[in-house]
């Protein structure tokens, strides 16, 4: 009995050669619409789908393969006599191979001119139905959804006249992943359209971006996936201009870097990170000076760090950066001279280019945190804050220079691991206390780090001070200005201590925990 294949694809790459090889192996080919036209034009003889179903394609192509003559031919179990007899009684011919890929829904909704009606018309119904029918019956039917599998299938058919069960099972698994991801994109689109903020089912889909050597530690397996609807301002979408593949820890650090720099738009700024904590932030009227400040903030921790700059990197800045061992540099652009400097004798230095003009769109994406047996979902911590809404709670008002420094410090503290304390002046960070289990411990660490540069500095805390002992430590160090959220039941104790020492203190009303 002649074997039959059904081919209906939107992605026609390689399909003509594939179909020709099938014909050479003695297969009959059923085809539909544009695929049939393409194969006929290439001289590949095909059977029209309506010759199989007995019905014409109708309703602008919405109905063409949803028919018992198709799905009976796909679903009939070859090892079940009752199935084969039912097929014979109803003049249903068996279909042994299905090659289908789906309407380009993802590509359609990514178009800038997309309309709701066009999106709906690009929801494939018949394609997923055929794929699922064939995949369910993979014991007998081979199903192909990816042109990358054409060669494997043809090779096995040529060698043995059929594919192996292992291949059919693998391809079926691929189909179910593919159709699940396809439906997830449709669900995400409709959920967005109706404004559903808390869906009872959460299905998100990602595509494999990079197979990784290992995860956070060598004993951990890891891979990097990119959101199926890509975010332009993301490490997954970054253009890599030089260097080795990014590691798991590189990606985590680089992601933290591009989040931090979003808050520093008004002036040239450089941020240096280690272990997802900013160890140096510098701000100036030009990027070279901003680099100087970021480097001076912590010239020890910068070794092996990640650097992000929010302006084009010029040759002068690159010359200063080049002697230092860095893991990653991220910027919106690089001059030709700067790139030449960076790549000279530094083939492993990872250089990434990102579209900083897409930052705003990246801020609306939800954050997902895995826990054992569950998933936490939250908005990003990107609340808009206006200093005019802040409250000076002490008798002394901040000076103009202190006010500028306090705004800078408040931006910087947002990405320090809690309990987080940062000491800055108006253009650079000077001391960092991160990740301590008590706040006064973080205060002491930050003061110790900044001890030789405390004149004219300010201090920011990511959450309220639970006790006035923090204020006593700060005052003893000579720091004169504090910014914190407030909100402790003992706020008045802290205010009284600040007034006693002549400090100025601002409450922002916004907490910035980071775990």
UniProtKB/Swiss-Prot annotation:
Pfam families: AICARFT_IMPCHas, MGS. Pathway: Purine metabolism; IMP biosynthesis via de novo pathway; 5-formamido-1-(5-phospho-D-ribosyl)imidazole-4-carboxamide from 5-amino-1-(5-phospho-D-ribosyl)imidazole-4-carboxamide (10-formyl THF route): step 1/1; Purine metabolism; IMP biosynthesis via de novo pathway; IMP from 5-formamido-1-(5-phospho-D-ribosyl)imidazole-4-carboxamide: step 1/1. PROSITE patterns: MGS. Belongs to the PurH family. GO terms for cellular component: cytosol. It comes from the Bacteria. Keywords: Hydrolase, Multifunctional enzyme, Purine biosynthesis, Transferase. Residues 1-145 form the MGS-like domain. This is Bifunctional purine biosynthesis protein PurH. The IMP cyclohydrolase activity resides in the N-terminal region. It comes from Streptococcus pyogenes serotype M2 (strain MGAS10270). Its EC number is 2.1.2.3, 3.5.4.10. GO terms for biological process: 'de novo' IMP biosynthetic process. It catalyses: (6R)-10-formyltetrahydrofolate + 5-amino-1-(5-phospho-beta-D-ribosyl)imidazole-4-carboxamide = 5-formamido-1-(5-phospho-D-ribosyl)imidazole-4-carboxamide + (6S)-5,6,7,8-tetrahydrofolate; IMP + H2O = 5-formamido-1-(5-phospho-D-ribosyl)imidazole-4-carboxamide. One of its GO terms (molecular function) is phosphoribosylaminoimidazolecarboxamide formyltransferase activity.
